[in-house]
A protein has these predicted regions:
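Short, small-residue-enriched loops and turns at beta-alpha junctions
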Residues: 1-4, 81, 98
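Charged C-terminal helix
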Residues: 134-169
């Protein structure tokens, strides 16, 4: 993924205990799958993007890995992909502004972890990515740059109407 230390740690962790949900950008999950990846620091490389041309190949690859690892994968990017051994979903919510600030991957990871407490990994990942993407779209409309966008993203996620949440009471 982004460093040999991080990659080796992830590989070792996967031998000790496989998480129910493994989230990463395309470069990270390609690397974890033993494929060539083109990461730039912690970001996915421009060559590691989900496209119409590679969609079916990547879906097959990641479904095989999800089955091998007995987990669900959330591959983030301009278009997110959630893959389990028997299901696949694509999420197109979000905005390029989300890649211009630090921490969106961590935020999404925490949302996924929260949702895992109340549902299965596939539903948790699809719901988290969709809702976080919607919050990003709303935040972009109300911000003037990356600083205000970051604050607005938190506010928009916090203020999503209860009926927009899958897990509302």
């Amino acid at each position: 993924a982004c460093s040999s230390l991080r990659y080796e740690f992830a590989q070792k962790l996967m031998t000790i205990h496989m998480p129910q949900l493994l989230k990463g950008n395309m470069s990270e999950l390609l690397a974890m799958s033993g494929q060539t990846a083109h990461a730039i620091g912690i970001d996915a490389g421009a060559q590691d993007v989900l496209t119409d041309a590679n969609c079916s190949h990547l879906k097959k690859l990641f479904q095989e890995k999800a089955a091998q690892w007995n987990t669900t994968l959330l591959i983030t990017g301009k278009k997110d992909m959630v893959v389990s051994p028997d299901k696949c979903a694509f999420i197109t919510n979000g905005t390029p502004a989300m890649s211009q600030i630090t921490g969106t991957g961590c935020m999404l990871g925490m949302i996924c972890a929260t949702y895992l407490a109340v549902t299965d990994p596939f539903t948790a990942a699809v719901t988290a990515a969709t809702e976080f993407g919607i919050a990003g779209e709303k935040a972009e409309k109300n911000s003037s740059g990356p600083g205000s966008f970051q604050v607005e993203l938190l506010d928009q996620f916090y203020n999503l109407p209860a009926q927009d949440y899958l897990f509302s009471q």
